[in-house]
Amino acid sequence: MLMWGLTGPIFGTIADKYGGHKAISIAFLFYIAGIYFLFSGPNTGIYFQISLGVLIGIGCGGTAISIPMAVVGKHFPLSNRTIAMSFVTAVGSFGYFLSPIFTNYSLQNHGWVQTLIYFMFFLIVGLAISYFVRSPSLNQSTETTNKQNSLSALKEAFKTKSYVLLIAGFFVCGFHITLVGTHVPKYVIDRGLEDWTAAMILSLIGLFNIFGSLISGYLSTKISKKIILSVIYLLRGVSICLFIFTPPSTISSIIFGASFGFLWLSTVPATSGIVAHIFGTKFLGLLYGLVFLSHQIGSFFGAYLGGLFYDLYGSYDYAWYLAIALSIFAGLIHLPIIEKPVLRLKEEPVLRLKTE
């Protein structure tokens, strides 16, 4: 999670400066190498950490949602940018829905080595497709008015209160997602439910996130994005409360999987849309990459603290209480965000594709 987050801004900078296909292609090479060494290397802890933790972590930094989101965002004007971004999230969610189903089938029928080979093949296909990714360029007359570099873009962003609030809010998003994704399987078993219930919850999350992302993207063109984010985070707290305070059952698990899935990554179109609206799209890869770094730091703590609380107290209760408190925190801190472009930003230009 941390390597994924730390390399996101680096790949974002590469995408901003040299083009999206270069950043994504480099990341795919790391990802493929990590998968290859995972099934072909020695079965030792350090080798496992290098392949899975470092190489695959770096690969995720450039192939996961933040970089494709930034690349797509550059192609669309403000009026429909968040809708376009929501489609990126929705397609990724469809993969999240299919992945556990395919993985479980392949592990049972072919074993883990062959399963990893299948995944490596999928990544090679992704590498080939990434060659066709193209970034837009501004028309020449407008490029001369925007002489910002990466450093000045960072200084401007961190002097902007709304950007800092977005970073804090996305930390909570990462905490929620990894707490649920990592610890719900153990939690539902501890409550006396079958292990297939956990797989069902995760699959429902992936499925309903498709709809949540698309609806969030559409609503972001109609109403304030900060209000959408506040509502999403507060509803996450409600969903968690209903899940942990109602008697365990298959029905309650289905309701939680569907409701939390609807809210899962529906934060992404609105969050990335605010970043693009405030600062423009020239350094969207870098600036959104840093917001996503906060998300991954939150993911680290969601996974770590969930396990720590369980080891200390023998239950996940305190982890869930913290998640609910963070929902309230995130719901409130988005309200002061000002959804207006910085004074530097000129009228957004018409984009045209360039051949890289």
List the model feature ranges, each with a label.
Residues 7-19, 213-224, 311:
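Helix-to-loop junctions at the C-terminal end of transmembrane segments
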Residues 29-43, 235-248:
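C-terminal ends and interior cores of transmembrane alpha-helices
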Residues 46-63, 171, 252-266:
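Hydrophobic core of transmembrane alpha-helices in multi-pass small-molecule transporters
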Residues 52-90, 280:
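Cytoplasmic helix-loop-helix junction between adjacent transmembrane helices
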Residues 87-138:
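Helix-loop-helix hairpin linking two adjacent transmembrane segments in secondary transporters
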Residues 135-152, 343-351:
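Flexible cytoplasmic inter-helical loops of multi-pass small-molecule transporters
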Residues 155-216:
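Extracytoplasmic gate region of multi-pass secondary transporters
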Residues 205-208, 222-274:
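C-terminal transmembrane helical hairpin of 12-TM major facilitator-type secondary transporters
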